[in-house]
Structure formats: structure tokens, C-alpha cells
Curated annotation (Swiss-Prot):
The gene is sodA2. Belongs to the iron/manganese superoxide dismutase family. Its cofactor is Mn(2+). Its EC number is 1.15.1.1. This is Superoxide dismutase [Mn] 2. Pfam families: Sod_Fe_C (PF02777), Sod_Fe_N (PF00081). Keywords: Manganese, Metal-binding, Oxidoreductase. One of its GO terms (molecular function) is metal ion binding. Homodimer. The keyword Thylakoid does not apply.
Length: 208
């Protein structure tokens, strides 16, 4: 049986305070994300030929899956992927400005870090309903985009480097309807060391 696992966080639920409260984080990770993982495993249970596929392989090739599980994999696999990256690119010691190679390419494609912040914040805040704002590698270029529901940039052939979750369950207990305030505060949690590592990995993967 396919057995995707809920990832363990590298920080405690209260360590992203005051920007993300511990109650929200514990429910978001321990309940919402866990449900996506369980539902994904259930969808794949009877398809042994898919049990050795990575999450990225499944999401990049949805059109090749049995039609009766496409929606379940898209929604729950997407939810697992999006949340896993969301946790990964945050840190109690986050915030500040980008460093390393990714800082240079951000300056190249956005002119300044503030321009990136502005564009990504607008993409996240203006996403109607539920979804995500992303910084992605598109070929050799960096760009900003947003996706609805649990869709990922992988489905468009782009490599995600940074993501913010703007589903209401990501912020409503603390911020209620104040999504812009949540997005502004979220920047204080961004783990730029990890974003830089993901950029370098993405560039390397494109060489193979």
C-alpha cells in the first residue's frame, strides 16, 4: 500500500508566534494536513502500480492516472504537497532578506526584494476564495503566481520555491478576515536559507 506520511515539523507549534499562533498551527498541521495524507493514501490503496510513484510524479502526470482517482489525487496529493512546502519554508528564525544565489536572481528578475514581496503579497491577497501564492522557477526565470484550491505549479511545469497558504484555515483563528495582515506578518517567518537550497536543487535538477 502507498503510505505517504505527515511530515514532522522542524519547530514546535508555538515557535512561529506571534505571526502564526500555536492553535492555528496545531490544527492546520495535525488535522487539515493529516486528512489530506490519509485521503491520498486511501485513494491510491487499490492501485499497486502507483505505490512507488513520488508525490511529484503523481501531480505532474494527473492525466495518466485512472480517471476515478484523478480528482482525489489532485486535491489530496496537492494538499499534501502544498502544506509540506509551506512548513518547510518557514522557521522561528525566519524573516529578513534573501541570501545566497536566490537573492541574486530575485534582484535580477524583480529588481528589488521589495518588488518581489509586493508582487507575491498581491498574488496571495487577491486569490479569490482558497489557494496559494507562489515564487516559482519557470525554466531559468523566477516568477510569481497563484493557484486555486490545492492546485500546484507542478501541473504547469514550474518548480515551486516558496509558498504562502491563504486558505482561511491558515489564518482565520487569529486574523479572521484580515488576510492582508496575515500575509504581511508571514514574511517574518520565511526561511531564506531553505528557499536558497530549493533554488539550487531546482537548477541542478534541470541539468539532468
Amino acid at each position: 500500500m502507498s503510505s505517504f506520511q505527515l511530515p514532522k515539523l522542524s519547530y514546535d507549534y508555538d515557535e512561529l508566534e506571534p505571526y502564526i499562533d500555536s492553535n492555528t498551527l496545531s490544527i492546520h498541521h495535525g488535522k487539515h494536513h493529516a486528512t489530506y495524507v490519509n485521503n491520498l493514501n486511501a485513494a491510491l490503496e487499490n492501485y499497486s502500480e502507483l505505490h512507488n510513484k513520488s508525490l511529484e510524479e503523481l501531480l505532474c502526470n494527473l492525466e495518466t492516472l485512472p480517471k476515478e482517482i484523478v480528482t482525489a489525487v489532485r486535491n489530496n496529493g496537492g494538499g499534501h504537497y502544498c502544506h509540506s512546502l509551506f512548513w518547510e519554508v518557514m522557521s522561528p528564525r525566519g524573516g529578513g532578506e534573501p541570501n545566497g544565489d536566490v537573492a541574486k536572481v530575485i534582484d535580477y528578475y524583480f529588481n528589488t526584494f521589495d518588488n518581489l514581496k509586493d508582487q507575491l503579497s498581491k498574488a496571495a491577497i487577491s486569490r479569490f476564495g482558497s489557494g496559494y501564492g507562489w515564487l516559482v522557477l519557470d525554466g531559468e526565470e523566477l516568477s510569481v503566481m497563484s493557484t486555486p484550491n490545492q492546485d500546484t505549479p507542478l501541473q504547469e511545469g514550474k518548480i515551486p520555491l516558496l509558498v504562502i497558504d491563504v486558505w482561511e484555515h491558515a489564518y482565520y483563528l487569529k486574523y479572521q478576515n484580515r488576510r492582508p495582515e496575515f500575509v504581511t506578518n508571514w514574511w517574518h517567518t520565511v526561511n531564506w536559507d531553505r528557499v536558497n537550497e530549493k533554488y539550487l536543487q531546482a537548477i541542478q535538477s534541470q541539468k539532468h
